[in-house]
Amino acid sequence: MQVLKINPRGYCYGVVDAMVIARNAALDKTLPRPIYILGMIVHNKHVTDAFEEDGIITLDGDNRLEIIEQVESGTVIFTAHGVSPEIRDIAKRKGLVSIDATCPDVTVTHDLIREKSAEGYDIIYIGKKGHPEPEGAIGVAPDHVHLVQSSNDIDSLNLTNDKLLVTNQTTMSQWDVAHLMDSLKEKFPHIEVHKEICLATQVRQEAVAQQAGEADLLIVVGDPKSNNSNRLTQVSVEIAGTPSYRIADVSELKIDWLKGINKVAVTAGASTPTPIVKEVISFLDQFDENDPSTHVIKRTVTLDKILPKIKTPKPVDKIMPHK
């Protein structure tokens, strides 16, 4: 089968940084145990399973407040998606050592919200309800930030403040964000616009928009919880006009999808491990619709191949608790 490997695809620097921080934490014997991650360090279950093998426990819950309530002692790692100041304070009050793996692009948005809310602005934040990144960003200034996900949310906004600003979750579809920002500019002509789609998200989406049209089908390799992976599927269908499926790994591929397909494109979300993507590409490369021996799907990538290798462990930056 013809396989079009869309570039760039896979890991972004924020994800790699977060994983390296967590791996160094696992190797740092001075950190109080147990070591917990507040939610998925990045939205990929293969990664969180690999960290469990490393002795780092991923805690789950509806929100970060609910998750940190589960922790009584040890060390907590804040995920790449960022956390609110309230969570940082609770960690300190509980006597926990904290490690911050927030993506630098998310920190930029937090700084913007902090600065503008102090100047008296109301901030409209375009993001996905229930996702940890908006939760952390809104928590920077809860009384000033208003989450919108759709045109209906914009219709129901009732803001009279002359100081208005719009920003967004870094992993949204850039076309959705542009559309919603246009609607906001119509409703509030004086609004200041700060588009914060991270570069990694942007270039991956643009690559799909430009290249997926050359194929009959696009396979996106990414976790179901990964917003940027799900957006790549959306971009393929809505912008490139190419049908698309998202799979967590090769075991989720369906042979029926490949019947009658001459050329398949492959990309991956920013938190998808490279070996997982390579395994999908290898399967598609050897696939022949008329040869049943090429239809056997088996995942062989083991957890020890998932995380970045650390040759020289480095001490992690610790945020110490209140004495």
From Swiss-Prot:
The keyword Metal-binding applies. One of its GO terms (molecular function) is 4 iron, 4 sulfur cluster binding. It comes from the Bacteria. InterPro entries: LytB/IspH (IPR003451). Isopentenyl diphosphate binds at H43, H81, H131, S226, N228, S271. It is an enzyme of class 1 (oxidoreductase). It catalyses: isopentenyl diphosphate + 2 oxidized [2Fe-2S]-[ferredoxin] + H2O = (2E)-4-hydroxy-3-methylbut-2-enyl diphosphate + 2 reduced [2Fe-2S]-[ferredoxin] + 2 H(+); dimethylallyl diphosphate + 2 oxidized [2Fe-2S]-[ferredoxin] + H2O = (2E)-4-hydroxy-3-methylbut-2-enyl diphosphate + 2 reduced [2Fe-2S]-[ferredoxin] + 2 H(+). The keyword Iron applies. Binds 1 [4Fe-4S] cluster per subunit. Its EC number is 1.17.7.4. GO terms for biological process: dimethylallyl diphosphate biosynthetic process; isopentenyl diphosphate biosynthetic process, methylerythritol 4-phosphate pathway; terpenoid biosynthetic process. Dimethylallyl diphosphate binds at H43, H81, H131, S226, N228, S271. Pfam families: LYTB. Keywords: 4Fe-4S, Iron, Iron-sulfur, Isoprene biosynthesis, Metal-binding, Oxidoreductase. The active site is at E133. Its cofactor is [4Fe-4S] cluster. Coiled coil: none annotated. (2E)-4-hydroxy-3-methylbut-2-enyl diphosphate binds at H43, H81, H131, T170, S226, N228, S271. [4Fe-4S] cluster binds at C12, C103, C198. Pathway: Isoprenoid biosynthesis; dimethylallyl diphosphate biosynthesis; dimethylallyl diphosphate from (2E)-4-hydroxy-3-methylbutenyl diphosphate: step 1/1; Isoprenoid biosynthesis; isopentenyl diphosphate biosynthesis via DXP pathway; isopentenyl diphosphate from 1-deoxy-D-xylulose 5-phosphate: step 6/6. Belongs to the IspH family. Catalyzes the conversion of 1-hydroxy-2-methyl-2-(E)-butenyl 4-diphosphate (HMBPP) into a mixture of isopentenyl diphosphate (IPP) and dimethylallyl diphosphate (DMAPP). Acts in the terminal step of the DOXP/MEP pathway for isoprenoid precursor biosynthesis. HAMAP family: IspH. This is 4-hydroxy-3-methylbut-2-enyl diphosphate reductase. It comes from Lysinibacillus sphaericus (strain C3-41).
